[in-house]
Swiss-Prot record:
The protein's name: 3-hydroxyacyl-[acyl-carrier-protein] dehydratase FabZ
Primary enzyme class: lyase
InterPro entries listed in its UniProt record: FabA_FabZ, FabZ, HotDog_dom_sf
Highest taxon of the lineage: Bacteria
Family the entry assigns: Belongs to the thioester dehydratase family. FabZ subfamily.
GO (cellular component) term, any one: membrane
MF (Gene Ontology): (3R)-hydroxyacyl-[acyl-carrier-protein] dehydratase activity
Taxonomic source organism: Ruegeria pomeroyi (strain ATCC 700808 / DSM 15171 / DSS-3)
Subcellular location(s) per record: Cytoplasm
Catalytic activity as recorded in UniProt: a (3R)-hydroxyacyl-[ACP] = a (2E)-enoyl-[ACP] + H2O
A single GO BP: lipid A biosynthetic process
Location of the active site: 54
Entry keyword annotation includes RNA-binding: no
Functional summary from the UniProt entry: Involved in unsaturated fatty acids biosynthesis. Catalyzes the dehydration of short chain beta-hydroxyacyl-ACPs and long chain saturated and unsaturated beta-hydroxyacyl-ACPs.
């Protein structure tokens, strides 16, 4: 069996995730391998509202938004990998483990979110992921997180 590597532009991402500005934290997903792994991209800009208060004069992307960007990348991976596009897909955090922040992420950075599925199966509701966020090849953050997949039905048109 061959696995086709896919990608997702912002239009497809918005057909999968319910998040919108200012909380849509994935600009594109450049690699999706089924529902087992993916690589997302976040172009970090000064226009993001969290930089007004985190921190004035020294803008640093909050760690929680880095972890959320990894989780959103995992959500896109599940949407494409499990063919649940244009649905009422919601994914809820259940826990975050072994989270470490290693490098600041600042405006102008291009952050890559690498996620892989550790547990979960096609049609399942509980998944565990490992995520690593990098900037210029340096690890910025890493975490393991579990999520509950809630597919409540088709979106109305």
């Amino acid at each position: 069996m061959t696995t086709e590597t896919k990608s997702a532009d912002i239009q497809l991402i918005q057909r999968i995730l319910p998040h919108r500005y200012p909380f849509l934290l994935v600009d594109k997903v450049v690699e999706i391998d089924g529902y087992s792994s993916a690589v997302g991209i976040k172009n970090v800009t000064m226009n993001e509202p969290h930089f007004q208060g985190h921190f004035p004069g020294t803008p640093i992307m909050p760690g929680v938004t880095i972890v959320e960007a990894m989780a959103q990348t995992a959500g896109v991976m599940l949407g494409v990998g499990m063919d649940i596009i244009d649905s009422e897909l919601l994914i809820y955090f259940m826990n975050i483990d072994n989270c470490k922040f290693r490098r600041k992420v600042v405006p102008g950075d291009v952050m890559k979110m690498h996620v892989e599925t550790l547990r979960g199966k096609m049609g399942g509701k509980i998944f565990k992921f490992r995520g690593t966020a990098t900037v210029e090849g340096e690890v910025a953050a890493q975490a393991e997180f579990s999520a509950y997949v809630d597919l409540t039905g088709e979106k109305s048109t």
